[in-house]
From Swiss-Prot:
It comes from the Bacteria. One of its GO terms (molecular function) is ATP binding. GO terms for cellular component: cytoplasm. This is NH(3)-dependent NAD(+) synthetase. Catalyzes the ATP-dependent amidation of deamido-NAD to form NAD. Uses ammonia as a nitrogen source. The gene is nadE. It catalyses: deamido-NAD(+) + NH4(+) + ATP = AMP + diphosphate + NAD(+) + H(+).
Amino acid sequence: MTLQKKIIELLGVKPAIIPEIEIKNCVDFLKKYLVNHVHIKSLIVGVSGGQDSTLTAKLCQMTAETLRKEKNDITYQFIALRLPYGIQYDEKDCQDAIRFIQPDQIFNVNIKKAVLSSEKSLKKSGVIISDYVRGNEKARERMKVQYSIAAMKQGLVVGTGHAAENITGFFTKYGDSGTDINPIAKLNKRQIRLLLKNLNCPKHLYLKKPMADLEDEHPQQDDESVLGVTYDAIDSYLEQKKIDIRSQKIIEALYLNTLHKRNLPITQ
């Protein structure tokens, strides 16, 4: 078996999808988990204004609405979290995403003071962190806030991770990857766009250039520039299509070099 086939089998990506069916599958997946865990009453997503969190949040809102109707239980809620670091440059996109999602509840928590406080404490101990490490601190602080709210709201922290991120290891260990449940894990980027389009998401949101925007020294740097390969190539690879050798080598190197992120924790 080639490495490509092994990865595809492991991540469970389909070569083609029907958006309506995938939307139903994702909602049913979330519904089933909540029904089987009666103490959980809310779904929680950090909404950044990007494709992944917009889709995940919309699916969660649909799930909460469906459960309220089917179970005649108004306690099922979707909670959207806005977790900016200072002033977010694409705040308009975030607000447009919120209007599209129509969440039951919204909490706004600015993480900048917490991140800088942690950095200051480390500096006092003689540890000066790099801009790159600070970026990971932001991702972990956001996850910490989500779990704090989940604990107070009988909530489940829902991940926005997908197959194109997973294969490249383009996530923060114990940050955005540290979630309870991931409904879109088997989708690639173009499939995410298809689902958003099917749900009548504003075009500028589902066509938005993906970027993590974690590093202060490289603001608005898009994912593809960091990875050195396009999402189109990654998606085609995950759909078992032939791609150029250079892109294939980059993708497979990224996968192998980030195995430690997908196998946690390391045990004897």
